[in-house]
Regions:
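Sec-dependent N-terminal signal peptides
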Residues: 5-15
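Structural scaffold elements adjacent to functional motifs in cytosolic proteins
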Residues: 41-43
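Short, surface-exposed ligand- or partner-binding patches at beta-edge/loop junctions that are enriched
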Residues: 92-94
Length: 136
């Protein structure tokens, strides 16, 4: 009986830790569609970048990497969970998609959000003549 119980717990533990997170790369039209459904867009760039280019209206500014490339994943997740309905997921946004790809992989590894939508960033947004607003 004990052996069956221990085996059951091991089985449950192993399968409970399998990542159900999903990373999906999306384009600008999909960004707009998902935002219209209430999925938050998290702009992970630095303040100097927001000031320089502007930001997407109704996005959330939460820097991930500082100017030295350092980050605090736990703090970032705590901030994002305050604004995200974890069922719907989050949209990550940076300059070119490079930073958000790294962040998405880190979030997937620990199953922080069920869905992480990765974008091509501000450069692709700008090239498609999409609207930006002044950072305030």
């Amino acid at each position: 009986m004990k052996t069956k119980l221990i085996t059951s717990f091991i089985f449950i533990f192993l399968f409970a830790n399998i990542s159900n997170a999903e990373i999906k790369n999306i384009g600008n039209n999909e960004i707009k569609r998902l935002m219209s459904l209430g999925i938050p867009l998290i702009d992970v760039r630095r303040k100097d970048e927001w000031v320089s280019t502007g930001v997407i209206k109704n996005s959330y500014m939460h820097t991930f990497f500082d100017k030295d490339g350092k980050y605090d994943l736990k703090s970032f997740i705590t901030k994002i969970k305050k604004i995200s309905n974890s069922e719907k997921g989050i949209i990550l946004f940076c300059r070119t998609g490079r930073r958000t790809t790294a962040i998405a992989k880190a979030l997937e590894k620990i199953n922080a959000f069920p869905k992480v939508y990765n974008t091509k960033g501000i450069k692709a947004w700008f090239l498609d003549d999409n609207e930006l607003v002044k950072y305030q």
